[in-house]
Amino acid sequence: SRIVARVEIKTNAQLQQMARAGVITSRALDAAVAAARPGVTTDEVNAAFERTMLELGGTSNFYGYYDYPATVCTSVNHEVVHGIPGDYVLKDGDILSIDGGAYVIDPATNRQWHGDSARTVLIGNASEARAELSAVTREAMWHGIAALATAKKVGEIGLAIEAYVTEEYGDKYGIIEDYVGHGIGSQMHMAPDVLNYAVRDMGPKIKP
């Protein structure tokens, strides 16, 4: 399997390499977001990400992964995740998810270290409903991240996310359970699974 089953513990030096990959991914996403506007194709959004990633010395960890043909995923409106860039022309009011990643190679060890992130973009004048959906999702993410300050187990992240959504909005919004977050490091997809919802099994312990 390409997915490592055990949780990978990193050294400080390895975390620094991951930070390099994360910065490259973030700046490439900045370029992709800036390119995403009415009249632009999702393929052009992909090209903006790729151009910046390469300029900064990163290598795509999406392209060629299980034969994936692009450097980002572009999911528009009803598409949940993993949409493939192409000739779709973005329109005023669309909601676009851009998911991309990059890796760097540690010159001391020749090992890869990966970054992977996503952004949601409201194209032009999106509806209030779509703007609220994006805002609620972002805030839920930050509640999950904040939970890490005191969490003992990985499952507390999903618990915090679900608690925020249900306590603030009741049943107005649901949480998709078909896809989950994941660990990252010397590979793009690694243990542990990071759920966005609460489950009985709280998963592995969090180690400093």
Give residue spans per PLM region.
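Active-site neighborhoods and metal-handling regions in enzymes and metal-associated proteins
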Residues: 1-208
